């Protein structure tokens, strides 16, 4: 996907730079803009990133691509002979670019040069005065308030406030005894304790493989910031668990999906979390890669709605049925049968998977529940198609911030008005395009990697403040071992060294 070399730069695409004179627009290196968290030494992310906005010589911003190779990016460590950094320049096709880079070692300082035809852009070169730590470096900032400021985290997050409002207090002693009794035999749970910035776990139930996603984000957080001592339970299953109607004796359980019929505390989904941790690693679908693969411009997109997936909900069967009746409006098909195998002859045959990026050849994306909320919604929103979202009792951590008719087109849960909504979108093309743009902006501004880290920390911080007894390393718990250091490029934490010298 990318190479690592002495100075690693990767550029996507082959469109030449715009450098014409005369009546053509000319890109201005001086007036173009560069900003973002990847220019700050102390913002540690698995893949750091910043933005470039192309501006012409008259000061006007480009609103379409000025060419995918107009900017050249070089990242180096002036004090080192070798620099292990993978770099990608992603053209968002709207006049802006994401530059993302993944570090495989830590450096005293880091120099970022952005050029256009050999000329520095904006205030390039940018020097990150370090140490600048890579993702696997265990060097937490002790001052969590300072970390929150560096990360530019929101003061309050409404979904967290709503979820925690069900629990005026939390007693770790009580939940340690009661939750395993109530849920431990029938469900898949992880009992975690964070103590002295170390992670401990005890699993309950048979199918606990998904703990790897929770282990990974907790270890990543503890490498970056001093986490509060906290004890909690994570539901590894699809469905939210705490369904008691009254507040009496409800249990705080963390889940990746919430519902209007449950009281679970919602976290970012394991899918979105994993895509953040593995950006420029083992995943190819993430919130940044989508932005560089949004297909043709709106006017050139296919005017049918597209959907692919498995048969995990009866409404999906209805969608495929609608597609067969109205192929001029909907292109929907199953890629796998599992839940309704006996109906495969009616709703099959199954079709081959298509690249997620190929979805954006279509103007209209249908988001419909699977077993719970469809975890693809963040990626659909950050593309440049308009999303038709099914009404649902299920929600992810950000749904309460979305507004129907502003960020997406709502569709009734039984899909009875889907055809009507599609026809509306076709007849109101400019309005549909505006909704697509608003949804995209929401995802760009709220669902990036730093937003996910902020959400997790604020959630655990708020939960820890409710505890009325001290979290404990319970009987049967084992430490979640951190990743071993790279012997070739070890991490030397200056914070730990300074603390040891006190």
UniProtKB/Swiss-Prot annotation:
InterPro entries: CAP10, Filamin/ABP280_repeat-like, Filamin/ABP280_rpt, Ig-like_fold, Ig_E-set, O-Glucosyltr/Glycosyltrsf_90
Compartments reported by the entry: Endoplasmic reticulum lumen
PROSITE patterns attached to this UniProt entry: ER_TARGET (PS00014), FILAMIN_REPEAT (PS50194)
Keyword field: Endoplasmic reticulum, Glycoprotein, Glycosyltransferase, Signal, Transferase
Short motif (Prevents secretion from ER): ranges: 499-502
Keyword Transcription in record: no
One GO CC term, this protein: endoplasmic reticulum lumen
Glycosylation site list: 152, 302, 414
Signal peptide positions on this chain: 1-19
Gene Ontology BP terms: protein O-linked glycosylation via serine
Pfam families registered for this protein in UniProt: Filamin, Glyco_transf_90
Post-translational modification: N-glycosylated.
Pathways per UniProt: Protein modification; protein glycosylation
Tissue: Widely expressed.
The protein's Enzyme Commission number: 2.4.1.-, 2.4.2.-
Filamin repeats: 24-130
Reaction it catalyzes: L-seryl-[EGF-like domain protein] + UDP-alpha-D-glucose = 3-O-(beta-D-glucosyl)-L-seryl-[EGF-like domain protein] + UDP + H(+); L-seryl-[EGF-like domain protein] + UDP-alpha-D-xylose = 3-O-(beta-D-xylosyl)-L-seryl-[EGF-like domain protein] + UDP + H(+)
GO molecular function: EGF-domain serine glucosyltransferase activity; EGF-domain serine xylosyltransferase activity; UDP-glucosyltransferase activity; UDP-xylosyltransferase activity
Xref: Gene3D superfamilies: Immunoglobulins
Family of this protein: Belongs to the KDELC family.
Role, per record: Protein glucosyltransferase that catalyzes the transfer of glucose from UDP-glucose to a serine residue within the consensus sequence peptide C-X-N-T-X-G-S-F-X-C. Can also catalyze the transfer of xylose from UDP-xylose but less efficiently. Specifically targets extracellular EGF repeats of proteins such as NOTCH1, NOTCH3, FBN1, FBN2 and LTBP1. May regulate the transport of NOTCH1 and NOTCH3 to the plasma membrane and thereby the Notch signaling pathway.
PANTHER family, sorted: KDEL LYS-ASP-GLU-LEU CONTAINING - RELATED, PROTEIN O-GLUCOSYLTRANSFERASE 2
Protein name (record): Protein O-glucosyltransferase 2
């Amino acid at each position: 996907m990318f190479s690592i070399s002495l100075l690693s730069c990767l550029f996507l695409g082959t469109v030449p730079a715009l450098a014409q004179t005369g009546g053509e627009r000319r890109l201005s290196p001086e007036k173009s803009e560069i900003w973002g968290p990847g220019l700050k030494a102390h913002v540690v992310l698995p893949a750091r990133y910043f933005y470039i906005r192309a501006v012409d010589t008259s000061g006007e911003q480009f609103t379409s691509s000025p060419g995918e190779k107009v900017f050249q990016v070089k990242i180096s460590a002036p004090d080192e002979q070798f620099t292990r950094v993978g770099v990608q320049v992603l053209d968002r096709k709207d006049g802006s670019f994401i530059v993302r880079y993944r570090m495989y070692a830590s450096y005293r300082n880091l120099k970022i040069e952005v050029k256009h035809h050999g000329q520095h852009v904006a205030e390039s070169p940018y020097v990150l005065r370090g140490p600048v730590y890579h993702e696997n470096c265990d060097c937490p900032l002790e001052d969590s308030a300072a970390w929150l400021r560096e990360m530019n985290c929101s003061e309050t997050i409404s979904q967290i406030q709503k979820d925690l409002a069900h629990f005026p207090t939390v007693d770790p002693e009580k939940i340690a005894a009661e939750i395993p009794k109530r849920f431990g035999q029938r469900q898949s749970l992880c009992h975690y304790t964070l103590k002295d910035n170390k992670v401990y776990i005890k699993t309950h139930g048979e199918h606990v493989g998904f703990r790897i996603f929770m282990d990974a984000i907790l270890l990543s957080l503890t490498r970056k910031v001093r986490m509060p001592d906290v004890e909690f339970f994570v539901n590894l299953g699809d469905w939210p668990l705490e369904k008691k109607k009254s507040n009496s004796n409800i249990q705080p359980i963390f889940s990746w999906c919430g519902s209007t019929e449950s009281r679970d505390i919602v976290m970012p989904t394991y899918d979105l979390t994993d895509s953040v941790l593995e950006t420029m690693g083992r995943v190819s679908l993430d919130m940044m890669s989508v932005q560089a693969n949004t297909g043709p411009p709106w006017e050139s997109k296919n005017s049918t709605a597209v959907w692919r997936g498995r048969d995990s909900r009866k409404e999906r069967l209805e969608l495929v049925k609608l597609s067969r009746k109205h192929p001029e409006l909907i292109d929907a098909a199953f890629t796998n049968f599992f839940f309704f195998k006996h109906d495969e002859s009616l709703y099959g045959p199954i079709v081959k998977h298509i690249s997620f990026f190929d979805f954006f050849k279509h103007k209209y994306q249908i988001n419909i529940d699977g077993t719970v909320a469809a975890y693809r919604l963040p990626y659909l929103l950050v593309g440049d198609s308009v999303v038709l979202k099914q009404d649902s009792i299920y929600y992810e951590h950000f749904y309460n911030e979305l507004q129907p008719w502003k960020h997406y087109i709502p569709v009734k849960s039984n899909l009875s008005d889907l055809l009507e909504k599609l026809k509306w979108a076709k007849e109101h093309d400019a309005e549909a395009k505006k909704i697509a743009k608003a949804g995209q902006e929401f995802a760009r501004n709220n669902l990036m990697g730093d937003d996910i880290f902020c959400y997790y920390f604020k959630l655990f911080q708020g939960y820890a403040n409710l505890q009325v007894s001290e979290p404990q390393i319970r009987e049967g718990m084992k430490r979640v071992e951190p990743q071993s250091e790279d012997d070739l490029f070890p991490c030397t934490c200056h914070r730990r060294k300074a603390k040891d010298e006190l």
